[in-house]
Amino acid sequence: MERAMEQLNRLTRSLRRARTVELPEDNETAVYTLMPMVMADQHRSVLELLSNSKFDVNYAFGRVKRSLLHIAANCGSVECLVLLLKRGADPNYQDISGCTPLHLAARNGQKKCMSKLLEYNADVNICNNEGLTAIHWLAVNGRTELLHDLVQHVTNVDVEDAMGQTALHVACQNGHKTTVLCLLDSGADINRPNVSGATPLYFACSHGQRDTAQILLLRGAKYLPDKNGVTPLDLCVQGGYGETCDILIQHHPRLFQTLIQMTQNEELRENMLRQVLEHLSQQSEVQYLKILTGLAEVATTNGHKLLSISSSYEAQMKSLLRIVRIFCHVFRIGPSSPNNGNDMGYNGNKTPRNQVFKVRNVSDVFRKINIKEMNLPKHTLIYQATSEQDPLELLWHSLDEWLVLIATELTKNKRDSSNIACILLKQSPLDQQDISLAHQSAIGESGNHDHLLASTRAGDLESCSAIGIQEPVADGQDVISMTANRLSAVIQAFYMCCSCQMPQGMTSPRFIEFVCKHDEVLKCFVTRNPKIIFDHFHFLLECPELMSRFMHIIKAQPFKERCEWFYEHLLAGQPDTDMVHRPVNENDILLVHRDSIFRSSCEVVFKSNCEKLKQGIAVRFHGEEGMGQGVVREWFDILSSEMINPDYALFTQSADGTTFQPNSNSSVNPDHLNYFRFAGEILGLALYHRQLVNIYFTRSFYKHILGIPVNYQDVASIDPEYAKNLQWILDNDISDLGLELTFSVETDVFGAMEEVPLKPGGASILVTQENKAEYVQLVTELRMTRAIQPQINGFLQGFHMFIPPSLIQLFDEYELELLLSGMPEIDVNDWMKNTEYTSGYERDDQVIQWFWEVVQELTQEERVLLLQFVTGSSRVPHGGFAYIMGGSGLQNFTIAAVAYTANLLPTSSTCINMLKLPEYPSKEILKDRLLVALHCGSYGYTMA
């Protein structure tokens, strides 16, 4: 009876408290009963359960073998923690990772739990398996208040973890200022290295912690490298930590020159160097000028080394251009606005010759420098004392003299350039002071290149030795071939420096005049080595006057190389340009309707940001799931075909029936000019992303896109008979024919004939033998240009949003057609040569042999359908099938094996240009199924 009453009481208590009222005898079961109560700090319930239980409070459970005391310390359940300690829980018990309850309390900032654990003699010096103590955990998380309490119990504040790192290391790395101060006040070793030799200052700099680095330096921390020689400054530059770098230089001024010299280290990321120098330059104008001077010094040194034939061209060229790029970046973003000089941008007029090599804005900046105040190296004083020019002016002066020298000798003897061999000599590497003295000497004593030549011809090499010349180049060597690349690289550097002083889009008059002055030599360079154009003469793309001087040489270069140059500059600064199907986000997807693709595409493209379209294109057809490269290609293909839809009246078919040009009567469509702009955007966007369009234009329209004047022969595309008549006029004497032609023509405008003058007063000016050529040109311009000028302007407005005029002029009208529309014919042999096989197929398999036999038998139109079925495009890019694009770049046409079942059709994955071809039992079945797929399944996408 008594036992029954006890059970009834337990039942009642359990129901009232909604929990068990006694622990199971099994520790494993009991601990999981207690654990949620401990986590919730339900100490009364825990006490009640433990009171009548034999449960082992030190029982370790779970994967990491922790006790309930660990759980209480980790969760901050201080009441349960005290209860467990009173019942004999071990405060120093370590889990499988070596952590004690004190470690967990410290890591999570449980102050009360820490205090109670210390009261019960928790050992603060115990390390976990990684060597971390409680003090490490407090330092990692910056728990300074708790650290103050704990250090009183610590015998060694510099206890090391497995990597030799102390609490000070990790506090500095994480930027906890008050924690660092507490540790230092408690006697932490400020210069203690870890196992790799890294000090606390090293750790602070590795994560750009300027505040903790400042504290360490103020407390006397030494500037020490690790065992691999990596310094705190190296770490600051590698991470782009400008503020921390500034702190280091304030305490160790000698590091400034080290930083400047680091611009030559090609292993350091250029953008990180820029970031650091940008921050430093914005601190004060003195600092800004000091950085410019330092960079100019290093650039000048590298430039002169590059002009030395004994140096490594590749290494010195890269180093010079890298330094100059950094210099220009710093120049543009300084705290002051040094771009206040008199240098006006090129506006198409020739610059007066008296402005050649006039000291301009960069030099004006250098004149502000007080050398003594800036404490620069001794050789800098030479520049200031002997010349008004900035350091870079010495390099530009040398460049000018070399070019003048070569021009003079080429003029005297164009076949033999050995006379100047003595001037273009191997030089030993010089330091900056040697170069400074040498060029002051060369400028002051020689005066000009004639003096240098005279002394060289006389055998007097004393003046040559003054600038480090050792021995002449071997006779018979082509001096221009040896020096053209080097001088061209310095010219590129000169252009960059001139450009950084100008408003964007304007070319420095000084550089314009420089190129004009050395025109013949530069043309000689590119004639000998055309690759120089693509490597160093990028300025041609930014100045029409200069481009016109070299255009005949540029267009003589291989089409492939010009294409590479075109895309190199077109895509500069655009990341991941091959992934044109990649959307920035869901809102950037172009959602279009297949049944109204032209109008719906026009709406979404006009609403889209131009820069985002350059970064990536994603297209989805309304009601279809598919997305990816194949869908993008199909969109361009169908959309370009819709442009010539007669319903829009935008383009008319030419006489040959295969090409199109703008319709002079397109105004029947009220929105025609906006549509022309849209057409221009689509073609520009397609060219930008290397997508082909399914449309061919007349040669005259390609000329309009390129800015090339049309001629009477272009009239043949729209009116062959009229073109023959114009040809006849030019070929025959019309003096006595009595044609009575005037400089006006009659034109049909919507059924009404109107007389249109070809020039002012043209109706009263007769066409004669003397002016007939002018007449033919004017009437050609009327038919081919004036009649469609608004349409051309609208198209170019859209096209130039993606393709700059300066870049597209690299090509002629035939090449532009190749770029836009690809090859009109499909070469089956090239197709076979550039096809891959997968999923079980090999080139020699019977099914593959049948497939290619069927392709040979297909009509040209069916081959186009097959190409479109697999790749999403009906055109082959320039260069053939080897250049077909896939979802992530070049992707060969691929045929994959699929198990055969009756009536199974071939399928495709257009994003990867893959034809999934069943293993058909006969050639006849293969051909039948393939044609069904081509004629019935070419459009529409679902997810593969």
Swiss-Prot record:
Source organism of this protein record: Xenopus laevis
Pathway of action: Protein modification; protein ubiquitination
A GO-annotated cellular component: Golgi membrane
GO molecular function: small GTPase binding; ubiquitin protein ligase activity; ubiquitin-protein transferase activity
Plastid found in the keyword field: no
Keywords in alphabetical order: ANK repeat, Cell cycle, Cytoplasm, Endoplasmic reticulum, Golgi apparatus, Membrane, Repeat, Transferase, Ubl conjugation pathway
Primary location recorded for the protein, binned into one broad class: Golgi
Locations listed in the record: Golgi apparatus, Golgi stack membrane; Cytoplasm; Endoplasmic reticulum
UniProt xrefs under PROSITE patterns: ANK_REP_REGION (PS50297), ANK_REPEAT (PS50088), HECT (PS50237)
HECT domain boundaries: 609-944
Residues of the active site: 911
Protein name: E3 ubiquitin-protein ligase HACE1
Chain positions of ANK repeats: 23-55, 64-93, 97-126, 130-159, 163-192, 196-226, 228-253
Pfam hit, one: HECT
PANTHER family assigned: E3 UBIQUITIN-PROTEIN LIGASE HACE1, HECT DOMAIN UBIQUITIN-PROTEIN LIGASE
Superkingdom: Eukaryota
Protein task: E3 ubiquitin-protein ligase involved in Golgi membrane fusion and regulation of small GTPases. Acts as a regulator of Golgi membrane dynamics during the cell cycle: recruited to Golgi membrane by Rab proteins and regulates postmitotic Golgi membrane fusion. Acts by mediating ubiquitination during mitotic Golgi disassembly, ubiquitination serving as a signal for Golgi reassembly later, after cell division.
GO terms (BP aspect): Golgi organization; membrane fusion; protein K48-linked ubiquitination; protein ubiquitination; regulation of cell migration; ubiquitin-dependent protein catabolic process
